[in-house]
Amino acid sequence: MRWSDRLLKNALTPGLAFALLLAGCGFQLRGEQKLPFDTIFLNTPPNSPLGATLSRQIRSGTDTRTVPQASEASAVLEILGEARDKDILTLNAQGRAVEYKLIYRLRFRLHDGKGREYIGPTELRAQRDISINDSQVLSKESEETLLYRDMQTDLVQQLLRRIAAVRPHADQG
């Protein structure tokens, strides 16, 4: 066996073994999410970042269409509220906060617009820790903004997974 053949064999074997392990454990890239509704109305405040994120995720990651009127939709996603909180985790010797816990909460419900509730009022919650250094206040503010945006995206993904688990015709006879 030539040196180049042996090198090729030694390089391919671990890669092939790794690929087989991943395939065997069920790992797969996140593909298109299947929502059980053809159309959905997003009841969010106009020009809200949350509404824009929801709409973008539904448009790009599902085959469900968003519609402008609740009467046209087979499901209505109602955002009941969202909140951002910031709790102090750690104080330094001078009594200044050096570490915070950022919390993002999202409350929603999903119904058909005609009285049938698919998901009752539910709160999703995400949190991240952030440390603060007095010399890096401005960069930490932008990091805080990015962390809140990241948490919002995470909660939108959780929300879409919950919607995907809904069985709209399960208890109809």
Where do the PLM segments sit?
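C-terminal motif of bacterial Sec signal peptides marking the signal peptidase cleavage site
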Residues: 21-24
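C-terminal/domain-edge helix-coil "capping" segments
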Residues: 138-173
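Bacterial N-terminal signal peptides that target proteins for export
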Residues: 2-14
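Bacterial signal peptide processing site
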Residues: 26-28
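Acidic/histidine-rich, surface-exposed loop or edge segments in extracytoplasmic proteins
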Residues: 34-41, 135-141
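N-terminal segment of the mature soluble domain
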Residues: 36-83
